[in-house]
Amino acid sequence: MWLEESQMKSKGTRHPQLIPCVFAVVSISFLSACFISTCLVTHHYFLRWTRGSVVKLSDYHTRVTCIREEPQPGATGGTWTCCPVSWRAFQSNCYFPLNDNQTWHESERNCSGMSSHLVTINTEAEQNFVTQLLDKRFSYFLGLADENVEGQWQWVDKTPFNPHTVFWEKGESNDFMEEDCVVLVHVHEKWVWNDFPCHFEVRRICKLPGITFNWKPSK
C-alpha cells in the first residue's frame, strides 16, 4: 500500500514540473508571432501617448485594438494605430459604420456620443477604404453639409473643405428639395456623393482620430 501511494505521488509530481515549461514555450511563440507579423493587441483602456505621457482619451471607449501599419516604401519605420474595438483603422484614423437609420443631425449626435464625428473624406485612398466597409444596398451620411450658406460645403469636424477632392455623382450637387447634407451611395458600380435632405433617415459612418505611435524595424 505504501509503495502504491509513493508511486502515485511520484507520478503526480512529474506533470506539474512540465507546466512552467509548456507555458513558457506558448508565451514565447505568441510573442514571436506578434512581432513577426502584423499584431492585433487589445487593451483595457483607451490611451494616448503625448509627450512621453500616457493619458486617458475617452471614458466611452474602454477597450482598443492596435494594428501595425507597414512602412511606406523608403521609410525607416511604420505606425501603430489603436482604435476602439470593432472600429477599423486607416492612416491614423478610426471608422465605424452603423446600420440603423437616423437623420443627419441625429447621426452626428450619435457619433458625438462616441467621442467622434460623422466621417470626413479628404483623399481618394480614404474614400476607397471607407466604401469597402459599406453595404452597396444602402446610403450613408457623411459629415458634410451646406445648411448655413447654400453651396458653401463644410465638414462637421471643421476640417477645411477641398473642392478639388470630391466624389460627386454626375450632375450633383444640385440642391433638389433642399438637399443640404451629403450621403455616400453606390450608383453605376461605384460609390459617389449625393446631396440629400438632412431630415431623411439613412445609415451613417463615424470617424475619430486613432491613437498612434511610431515603430522602427530592428536591425
Swiss-Prot record:
What InterPro entries does UniProt report for this protein, alphabetically?
C-type_lectin-like (IPR001304), C-type_lectin-like/link_sf (IPR016186), C-type_lectin/snaclec_domain (IPR050111), CD209-like_CTLD (IPR033989), CTDL_fold (IPR016187)
Q: Which UniProt keywords apply?
A: Adaptive immunity, Calcium, Cell membrane, Disulfide bond, Glycoprotein, Immunity, Innate immunity, Lectin, Membrane, Metal-binding, Receptor, Signal-anchor, Transmembrane, Transmembrane helix
Query: What are this entry's molecular-function GO terms?
Result: D-mannose binding; immunoglobulin receptor binding; metal ion binding; pattern recognition receptor activity
Kindly report every residue range on the membrane side named Cytoplasmic: 1-20
* Membrane-protein topology: Single-pass type II membrane protein
Q: In Gene Ontology terms, what is a biological process of this protein?
A: innate immune response
List residues traversing the bilayer.
21-43
Asked if the keyword Glycoprotein belongs to this entry, the reply reads: yes
Q: Which residues are glycosylated?
A: 101, 110
- Please describe the organ and tissue distribution of this protein's expression: Constitutively expressed in myeloid cells including dendritic cells (at protein level). Expressed in the macrophage populations of bone marrow, spleen, lung and lymph nodes.
Cystine connections: 83-94, 111-206, 181-198
In terms of PANTHER family, this protein maps to: MANNOSE, PHOSPHOLIPASE, LECTIN RECEPTOR RELATED (PTHR22803)
Name recorded for this polypeptide: C-type lectin domain family 4 member D
> What phylogenetic lineage does the species belong to?
Eukaryota, Metazoa, Chordata, Craniata, Vertebrata
Q: Name the gene that codes for it.
A: Clec4d
